[in-house]
Amino acid sequence: MPIVISDTLTGTKRELQPIEPGKIRFYACGPTVYDSAHVGHGRSYVVWDLVVRHLRARGYEVRYVRNFTDVDDKIIRRATERREDPVALAARYAREFDEDMDALGNLRPDVAPKVSEHVPQIVAMISSLVEKGFAYAAANGDVYFSVRAFPDYGRLSKRNLDDLLSGARVEPGEAKRDPLDFALWKAAKPGEPTWDSPWGGGRPGWHIECSAMTLAHLGVPIDLHGGGKDLVFPHHTNEIAQSAAAVGDGRTAESFCRHWMHHGFVEIDSEKMSKSLGNFFTLRDVLAKFDAEGVRLFYLGTHYRNPINYSDAILAEAERRLNYFYETLEKVDALAEGTSPAGEGGGVVEDARRALDDDFNAPQVLAVLAEAFTAANALADKRGKKTPEDRARLAAFARDVREIGTTLGLVQRRPAEALRAIRARAAARRGIDPASVEAKIVERAEARRARDFARSDAIRDALLAQGVALMDGPQGTTWKVE
């Protein structure tokens, strides 16, 4: 079955058609590392991780490049505020970002280039644009792209030049010929990082950075480019223009990239979460409160193109759902131990993959899994001894769920280990000490062995009053935070 995506360039859902059959060259815009990653960044890279995982599961050879913007106005400002070297500041936040992405279960990209390591390639690309007449050097040492020289400008963002001109302005100190033009190279200023160039010392503009790194690590044209909806204009619009002008046909967006995908924002009270608005939560702080896999499940519960509302209550619900998944798997694993799965798989896995083929519809996959978990629990909880066929069906369920979980990045831990971790996070949020709960469970077990059921019930009720529910099963007593 073909994979269909919502392509921002055409404004339609259409089949993903790689330039070279069976291979996908994919570039996702990475973070500007001037601060800790926030919850919105986590959503972005879980989305692209899902895209890469599913494409590979469907047999595509994917080369995934995601950059670090470590040369930028925001980095310079933050370093100045903190009296810190901007290179060191960016390197520290890049390391922290990688740690956060690892915690979320994201695969590392094949290449994670940094702007600071690609300045010669950037200078070469700008030189090519100047030579071809798409860019010009100003007297002050800046270099600008001439927007009107590229006929397909604004197609991605569905904006024409007249609309853009009405909102354009020339900032003080800029030497552009046309308010629509944008900087490819910025002349050196005191206290800023500087590199040599044919136009004098300076540093790259934001947009040219991604174009040069795409060319360096994927070549042009590429098959797929991704980012948040806030990048459609101006960043991706400008990327298309300068890339197609420098190494494409100079006329069409497709000569740089064939397909474009953009995800929705994480919102708080219907407003985009962002550092500039000051309404953000760092990913690191959220991962300290909630199980990382639960946070991943939270992201996957909303289609990537739609906005997703953030709150602690919604995250806690995602964590409870994950707890249910692992409780079911723990129960099923015990019942199906030593049993070969029935059949060769299919149903659940193929239904899930078909949902992902349709514009990476993760919420539909979770709906498929919800039905499978309901059926598995009904079978596992059925009274009476399990038949060999029952155990084989349960084994098949566990196999299939874990198989599709490799694409979602979910349910890959041992259930007992996952449940301990989830309980510990939930308990910590309520000020409950897991060790004291475990001690009470031991005390209750001793009371039950002594047939002191009044004491046993009192312990259970006291824990429940604290928000801890006990569950007795064949494997012993477990607990969860209500």
From Swiss-Prot:
Q: What class of enzyme is it?
A: ligase
Motif 'HIGH' region: where in chain = 31-41
Instruction: Report the EC code(s) recorded for this entry.
Output: 6.1.1.16
**SUPFAM superfamilies xref list:** Anticodon-binding domain of a subclass of class I aminoacyl-tRNA synthetases, Nucleotidylyl transferase
A Gene Ontology molecular function term for this protein is: zinc ion binding
Q: Could you tell me what reaction this enzyme catalyses?
A: tRNA(Cys) + L-cysteine + ATP = L-cysteinyl-tRNA(Cys) + AMP + diphosphate
Subcellular location per UniProt equals:
Cytoplasm
Q: Which GO terms describe its cellular component?
A: cytosol
**Taking the first listed entry, what is the main subcellular location of this protein, grouped into a coarse class?**
cytoplasm
Where does this protein hold Zn(2+)? C29, C210, H235, E239
Binding-site residues for ATP, renumbered to this chain: K275
Question: Subunit structure of this entry?
Answer: Monomer.
Q: What is this protein called?
A: Cysteine--tRNA ligase
Organism expressing this protein natively: Anaeromyxobacter sp. (strain Fw109-5)
| Recorded name of the encoding gene | cysS
